[in-house]
Amino acid sequence: MKTFIYITCLLMAFTVLPTNAEINNISQALNESGRLRMLSQRLAKAYLLKAMDIQPEKVNKQLTDSANKFEQNLIELKAFSNSINNSDTLKVAIDIIDLQWQDYRKVLSQADTRAPADTILALSDRTLVACESLVMQLEKTAQRQSARWVNLSGRQRMLSQRIAKLYSAISLSGNKDLYDDGLQQAVHEFDVALQALINSPDNTHFVNHKLKKVATQWNFSKQGFKSLNKGNSTPLVIFMTTESILNQMNDITALYEAIDNKKKRIATS
């Protein structure tokens, strides 16, 4: 396990959330709305890790940066929805996210009192459901098969953080039975989606190269899940490996965004 942790540390890259940028097209809106899904889970994960005093400086930075990015993305998505035709359903979806976010943010920002894990998990899940609805509506609006890959690859970012969140919940509570079904479901969804992305006919050679790296990292990461099945909890290892996967999937989602936007330009030229 020491070797595993050491190698994991070498593989882990420092996660930097993208700087704010105006959303100009559906492809970008898909990417950035999908990022909201990831942030909903990342915030809960960081909250639980903070409760366990794991990587406190990095975790506190994650909480602040993720909350700021969530709010900025909401602002940009609202502006984008106001700039396109027939966007009433998008506006309603964004308003629902905003309402869920207000409740979530209120609990997250209570510095002097720690909310129960179940409260944070429930709020993160409700926010996730609202964000998922917006992404699906944007994919439907795009009406392109290539838009699916932006959605699916972006969803892998969310799953990386959801896995870390649920693993952290098990580590904090000591109750594997309570959260294990959700954890295993997230792992299964990641497996299935990764295979679908690998088989995408829209992949460039570079996308295939990046996906192969993710597959290698993902298989490596599963060692951490096996240790949990043996009764050993290693939240720090999972924190680091899921960060690496998040970074890689973020790059891949940007590549799919560019592919989708190119197909749109070709179709309308």
Which stretches of residues belong to each language-model region?
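Extended amphipathic alpha-helical interaction segments
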Residues: 117-205
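Hydrophobic faces of stable alpha-helices that mediate helix-helix packing
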Residues: 33, 37-40, 67, 74, ...
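C-terminal amphipathic alpha-helix
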Residues: 117-146, 227-269
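Heptad-repeat alpha-helical coiled-coil/4-helix-bundle sensor or tether segments in soluble regions
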Residues: 62-119, 126, 187-232, 240, ...
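N-terminal signal peptide c-region/cleavage motif recognized by signal peptidases
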Residues: 13-18
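Structured alpha-helical bundle/scaffold domains in large eukaryotic membrane-trafficking regulators
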Residues: 51, 55, 171, 175, ...
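N-terminal extracytoplasmic segments of bacterial inner-membrane proteins
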Residues: 24-55, 144-175, 243-253
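Positively charged n-region of N-terminal signal peptides that target proteins for export
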Residues: 1-5
